[in-house]
């Protein structure tokens, strides 16, 4: 057993509400001891026990690694021209997904693996240590299974999303596609996934179709999540609560009844601020959700069409500026909130026995993540207690 002491931490975010140190449980002049990839101790630097090795944080802020609970990384092709068209006034429509479906079906395994690996590494450099990844750009039995197998190379949090949109070959017979998803596709894909997701939205899947798909996934041992209420008011949030989904994602257009349902449930509302940023859509009112008692997570929603970024610090800044979260709330949502959205208790916070996933910031406080938007503040990232990325300055 080897131990690592990280000391001289200027500001340590623990997300431990029992410390009587604000909602983030912030400790000053702190230290952390890691043993065999897990948190073994944390507290004041002056009380830190000895360890085999030492990392001097040099006054930096240290936070739990970000937990990204919503990502679409298995794809091929480029939709930058679609983005440019939106910036020229063309409204966003979910149908653009079909463009990526064609490119993904035509791509080699090597191409898909290269893209996923590159984007996961990009997310890691911005502090993300836990990452969910969905299928959804194959939309045949064979292609969806391939996408899940590619996703499994970078994460255990693999989501089957054959119900992303109805593929072109089923445009006239969408119920036949739903039947395929509920039977042969899930039979083949469920063993390769942990979660089942559905885009419950106009232009995608209606309430009855979405419910049937989620129930078919649940019957095969998958846990549900829902893309809900992104493009307009709809039944997605209520369906998510009905199915005890881990999360309802987007939640841009929600009613008082939707918010009350979320607040009284175990379903997390995952906000995806980069999607609104990239589509010029109205932002959901995060303040309204939090004040009502809804548990909120943040995610970049990395995908090639409506939000092509993996950068959680950017999302924190946008959530503070446009969704009216405080910096503390946004950092909590990007760490502990994401863990709640994945129903994980071993990441997103510091506790003895939790996974030692940490990000060191070139800043004295986590507030700088919102205060200095666009600045690459992540100086080092630890996953399972090992430094997996760092700038030269951290150890020089």
Swiss-Prot record:
The lineage of its organism: Bacteria, Bacillati, Actinomycetota, Actinomycetes, Mycobacteriales. The keyword Secreted does not apply. Gene3D superfamilies: Metal-dependent hydrolases, Urease, subunit C, domain 1. 4-imidazolone-5-propanoate binds at residues 79, 137, 164, 230, 306. Its cofactor is Zn(2+); Fe(3+). One of its GO terms (biological process) is L-histidine catabolic process to glutamate and formate. It is an enzyme of class 3 (hydrolase). N-formimidoyl-L-glutamate binds at residues 137, 303, 305. GO terms for cellular component: cytoplasm. Belongs to the metallo-dependent hydrolases superfamily. HutI family. This is Imidazolonepropionase. Binds 1 zinc or iron ion per subunit. Zn(2+) binds at residues 70, 72, 227, 301. Catalyzes the hydrolytic cleavage of the carbon-nitrogen bond in imidazolone-5-propanoate to yield N-formimidoyl-L-glutamate. It is the third step in the universal histidine degradation pathway. The keyword Transferase does not apply. InterPro entries: Amidohydro-rel, HutI, Metal-dep_hydrolase_composite, Metal_Hydrolase. Keywords: Cytoplasm, Histidine metabolism, Hydrolase, Iron, Metal-binding, Zinc. The gene is hutI. Pathway: Amino-acid degradation; L-histidine degradation into L-glutamate; N-formimidoyl-L-glutamate from L-histidine: step 3/3. It is found in: Cytoplasm. Its EC number is 3.5.2.7. It catalyses: 4-imidazolone-5-propanoate + H2O = N-formimidoyl-L-glutamate. It comes from Mycolicibacterium smegmatis (strain ATCC 700084 / mc(2)155) (Mycobacterium smegmatis). Pfam families: Amidohydro_1. It comes from the Bacteria. Signal peptide: none annotated. GO terms for molecular function: imidazolonepropionase activity; iron ion binding; zinc ion binding.
């Amino acid at each position: 057993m080897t131990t690592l002491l990280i000391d001289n931490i200027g500001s340590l975010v623990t997300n431990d509400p029992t410390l009587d140190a604000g909602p983030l449980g912030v400790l000053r002049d702190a230290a952390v001891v890691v043993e065999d990839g897990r948190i073994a101790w944390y507290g004041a630097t002056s009380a830190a026990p000895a360890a085999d090795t030492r990392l001097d944080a040099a006054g930096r802020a240290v936070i739990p690694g970000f937990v990204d609970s919503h990502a679409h990384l298995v794809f091929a092709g480029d939709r930058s021209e679609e983005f440019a068209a939106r910036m020229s006034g063309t409204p966003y429509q979910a149908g653009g997904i079909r463009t990526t479906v064609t490119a993904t079906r035509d791509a080699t395994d090597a191409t898909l693996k290269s893209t996923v690996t590159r984007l996961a590494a990009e997310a890691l450099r911005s502090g993300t240590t836990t990452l969910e990844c969905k299928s959804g750009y194959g939309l045949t039995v064979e292609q969806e299974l391939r996408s899940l197998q590619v996703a499994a190379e970078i994460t255990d949090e693999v989501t089957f999303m054959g119900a992303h949109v109805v593929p072109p070959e089923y445009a006239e017979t969408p119920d036949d596609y739903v039947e395929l998803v509920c039977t042969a596709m899930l039979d083949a894909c469920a063993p390769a996934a942990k979660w089942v997701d559905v885009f419950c939205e106009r232009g995608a899947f209606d309430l009855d179709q979405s419910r049937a798909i989620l129930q078919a996934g649940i019957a095969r041992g998958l846990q549900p999540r829902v893309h809900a209420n992104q493009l307009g008011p709809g039944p997605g949030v209520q369906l998510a609560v009905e199915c005890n989904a881990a999360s309802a994602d987007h939640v841009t257009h929600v009613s008082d009844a939707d918010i009350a349902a979320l607040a009284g449930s175990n379903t997390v509302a995952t906000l995806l601020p980069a999607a609104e940023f990239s589509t010029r859509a109205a932002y959901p009112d995060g303040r309204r959700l939090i004040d009502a008692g809804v548990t909120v997570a943040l995610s970049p929603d990395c995908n090639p069409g409506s939000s092509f970024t993996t950068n959680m610090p950017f999302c924190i800044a946008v959530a503070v500026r446009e969704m009216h979260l405080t910096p503390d709330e946004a950092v909590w949502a990007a760490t502990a909130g994401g863990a709640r959205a994945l129903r994980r208790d071993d990441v997103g916070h510091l506790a003895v026995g939790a996974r030692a996933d940490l990000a060191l910031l070139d800043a004295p406080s986590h507030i700088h993540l919102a205060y200095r938007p666009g600045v690459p503040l992540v100086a080092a990232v630890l996953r399972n207690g090992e430094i997996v990325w760092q700038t030269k300055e951290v150890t020089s």
